C-alpha cells in the first residue's frame, strides 16, 4: 500500500520544513525500510507532500511516522494538521 501525507507550511518555515521532511524520509528508509519521496503542490509551493510506497503494515508505519514527526521537530514547522491518506491496489 501507499501512504500520502500532506500539510501546509509558512514561507518563513518552508526551507526548514523541507529539510526536516527529507530527513524524515531518510529515517523511514533506515529505520523501517520504507522508501519515500517529497513533492510540493505545483500551484502552491507551501503545500508539501510525503509519499511512502510499499508499506506492508500501514497501521504500524503510521504509528512510527507519528512518533518520528514529533521527535524530529517537523511537527512544529507545520501550519495546522498533517493529512494522511492510505491507498491500496484496486486492480
Q: Predicted regions span which residues?
A:
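Short S/T/G/P-rich N-terminal loop/turn motif that feeds into the first structured element of a domain
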Residues: 1-66, 84-91
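Conserved short beta-strand edge segments in small beta-sheet-based binding/regulatory domains
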Residues: 71-87
Amino acid at each position: 500500500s501507499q501512504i500520502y501525507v500532506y500539510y501546509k507550511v509558512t514561507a518563513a518555515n518552508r526551507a526548514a520544513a523541507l529539510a526536516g521532511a527529507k530527513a524524515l524520509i531518510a529515517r523511514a528508509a533506515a529505520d523501517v525500510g520504507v522508501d519515500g519521496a517529497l513533492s510540493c503542490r505545483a500551484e502552491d509551493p507551501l503545500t508539501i507532500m510525503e509519499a511512502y510506497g510499499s508499506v506492508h503494515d500501514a497501521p504500524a508505519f503510521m504509528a512510527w511516522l507519528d512518533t518520528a514527526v514529533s521527535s524530529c521537530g517537523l511537527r512544529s514547522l507545520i501550519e495546522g494538521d498533517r493529512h494522511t491518506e492510505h491507498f491500496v491496489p484496486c486492480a
